[in-house]
């Protein structure tokens, strides 16, 4: 099985940051990416389990994978159009 988290185009370390900082940093990072590129987000704020999927839905990006069973949380998103 391939580890989806192993080769992202970009990585964002949001460890230690609290809402709303992680999603604000994700938005800023994604804005500078090209459509189709991937971003690995590493976070430990429980609010990201709600905020990151919500951000992807609202902004029409794909949540490719998430790992939220333990800390740190990991999310892989693919930029939409």
Curated annotation (Swiss-Prot):
Matching CDD domains: SirA
Main location: cytoplasm
Source superkingdom: Bacteria
Pfam families (UniProt xref): TusA
UniProt key word Cytoplasm: yes
Catalytic residues identified in the record: 19
Entry's Gene Ontology BP terms: tRNA wobble position uridine thiolation
Metabolic or biological pathway, per its Swiss-Prot or TrEMBL entry: tRNA modification
Assembly and interaction partners: Interacts with IscS.
Similarity comment: family membership: Belongs to the sulfur carrier protein TusA family.
Name this protein carries in UniProt: Sulfur carrier protein TusA
Organism this protein belongs to: Escherichia fergusonii (strain ATCC 35469 / DSM 13698 / CCUG 18766 / IAM 14443 / JCM 21226 / LMG 7866 / NBRC 102419 / NCTC 12128 / CDC 0568-73)
């Amino acid at each position: 099985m391939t580890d989806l988290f192993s080769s992202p185009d970009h990585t964002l370390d949001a460890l230690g940051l609290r809402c709303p900082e992680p999603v604000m940093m994700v938005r800023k990072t994604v804005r500078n990416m090209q459509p189709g590129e991937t971003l690995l987000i590493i976070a430990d704020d429980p609010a990201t389990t709600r905020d990151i999927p919500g951000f992807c839905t609202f902004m029409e990006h794909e949540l490719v994978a998430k790992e939220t069973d333990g800390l740190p949380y990991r999310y892989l998103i693919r930029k939409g159009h």
